[in-house]
Amino acid sequence: VGTSPYDETVQLKENTPFKTKNETINRLVEYQKESAAKNNWEFTDLNAPMTAINQQYQQKDPTFTLCGSDRIHPDNDGHMVMAYLFLKAQGFVGKEVADMEINANKKQAVKSENCTVSNIKKNGKDLSFDYLAEALPYPLDTIARGWGQKKSQAEVLKVVPFMEEMNRETLKVTGLKGNYKLLIDDEEIGTWSGDELAKGINLAAESKTPQYQQALTVMHLNEYRWEIERTFREYAWCEFGFFQQK
C-alpha cells in the first residue's frame, strides 16, 4: 500500500511545510509499486488520490486537508477516505449491504440480494414482510473521536461517494399509492410516498433502524478495543522514551 500523503499545499497557521517531502514519500511509493510488480503482489496507492482530493478542495478552501493539523496524520475523514480507497481497490464498489424489491400487488419479492425477504402480507393498505439481512450498514460516526481530531467520519461524504458506492441497503416497493409509514420491529423509521418507495430508499442512511443501532454497538465496541490498544502502545512509548536507562 502506498502511504497517505504529506500535504505541502494546505495553508495552516504556524505550520511551515517541508517542501518536496511528499516527493520523497512518492519515491518510496514508486519503489513499493515496482517491488509489488516484480513479486506479483497486489498494490494500491493512497498518496496520489488523496493528494488530488486535497488539491481539488483547496482551490475553494486553502485550509482544507485530509491530513490533519500536522500535514501527515489524517483526521477521521482522511482515515475514511483511506478505507474507501482500499475497499475500492479490492472491487468493493457496488457491493450492497442488501437490495430488496417487493411487488405489493402480487405480494412477491422481486429481488432479495444479500438478504432474505419472506412472509409478505397485505391487509388493506398495510403491507408487512420479514427481512433478514446478511450484513449490517456502516454507521458513519458524526463525532470527531480521538485526541486532537477535528473532523468526524461523516465528513467523508463531502469528498467521496461512499454511501452511493459502498453503503446501500435498498428497499424498493412498487404498487403503492399515497404515503406510507415504515416501521421495523415497531420502531417508526420515517414516511415516504409510493413514488419514493418505487424508486427505492437507502435504509443505511436511516439511523433509527434496528440494524443501524446494531452496527453502532459494533462501532462502539471497536472504539473500546482501539482505546485499550492505544493505551498499551502509549505506555510502551513512554517506557521506551523516558524510563529506560541511559
Task: Give, region by region, the residue ranges found by the protein language model.
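Conserved catalytic region of serine esterases and O-acyltransferases that act on ester linkages
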Residues: 62-246
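Flexible loop/turn segments at secondary-structure boundaries
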Residues: 8-10, 50-53, 136-137, 190-191
